[in-house]
Design a protein with these regions (language model features):
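Self-maturation zones of extracellular/virion spikes and adhesins
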Residues: 1-85, 102-104, 108-115, 160-166, ...
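Small/polar residue-rich beta-strand/coil "junction" motifs that cap repeat-based extracellular fibers
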Residues: 77-79, 89-99
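Terminal (often C-terminal
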Residues: 95-161, 182-184, 217, 222-236
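Noncatalytic modules at the cell exterior or secretory-pathway interfaces
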Residues: 199-212
């Protein structure tokens, strides 16, 4: 530097000082980097068509924050490779998506005959979506402790008169009666129960949908996405 006002010096206190144009702009110790000035800024990249990232190198697991240049998104994810396991993505319009956030929607594509001797698990054979793959064998399993919202619609037909139709959320050791309908005095009952609830769950707790009745004679749970479905997602 011709006028000797730009320098990198090692002080006697084991600190490296960086000065540009006569102004201290940064200090570096064995565990800390401090940027000085009125508007300190760190720029990663040079406007080229390339990905840029910061990797946090943990003992058991790495994480990254970076720019996915091909998609023009800022991503936060697991691992050192950008975009391999994205937990959160921010696009150029400020829209945020969470590709691994627990969220599912399943429905019946065929009817299910039910007898009146036992409470019956409602089965689901079609997944519209299942982020994080937490739903299987008609049961949702919570991957983490939190508050979960569940909603369901159950269509039923040929329930005999003089009794009740009851739909339950069965959550591990808890049973939540979410819908009850009197069968009335008709020879048969056609109906739909639509229900929703927010439930506190621990990791590995499960939730499934059940139906029961005290009417005489068998009945059926109807199919089709708009009649019998089950959905849920992590709230907080």
């Amino acid at each position: 530097d011709a006028d000797a006002d730009t320098s990198i010096t090692a002080d006697t206190d084991d600190q490296v000082d960086i000065r540009v144009g006569g102004t201290d702009v940064a200090t570096l110790t064995n565990s800390n980097l401090v940027l000085k000035g009125t508007t300190p800024t760190v720029t990663i990249g040079d406007a080229g068509a390339e990905d840029a990232k910061i990797v946090f190198d943990g003992n058991a697991q790495d994480y990254h924050i970076g720019l996915d240049d091909s998609a023009d998104t800022l991503v936060i994810g697991k691992g050192s490779a950008l975009g391999t396991t994205t937990s959160m993505s921010f696009d150029a319009n400020g829209i945020i998506t969470k590709p691994l956030q627990p969220c599912f929607f399943v429905y019946k594509s065929s009817s299910q005959d039910v007898d009146t001797t036992n409470t019956t698990d409602i089965t689901f054979d079609t997944e519209r979506f299942d982020l994080n793959s937490d739903f299987g064998s008609n049961v949702f399993t919570a991957p983490v402790t939190g508050k979960y919202h569940f909603s369901a619609s159950v269509g039923y037909v040929n329930a005999q008169a003089g009794g009740n139709i009851m739909v339950y959320f069965q959550v591990s050791n808890a049973e939540i009666l979410a819908h009850r309908k009197d069968a009335g005095s008709d020879d048969s009952v056609y109906g739909t129960g639509q229900i929703s609830v927010v439930i506190d769950m621990d990791a590995s707790d499960t939730c499934k949908l059940q139906i029961d009745t005290n009417t005489d004679g068998d009945y059926a749970v109807e199919s089709a996405v708009y009649r019998t479905y089950f959905s849920g997602y992590l709230v907080a």
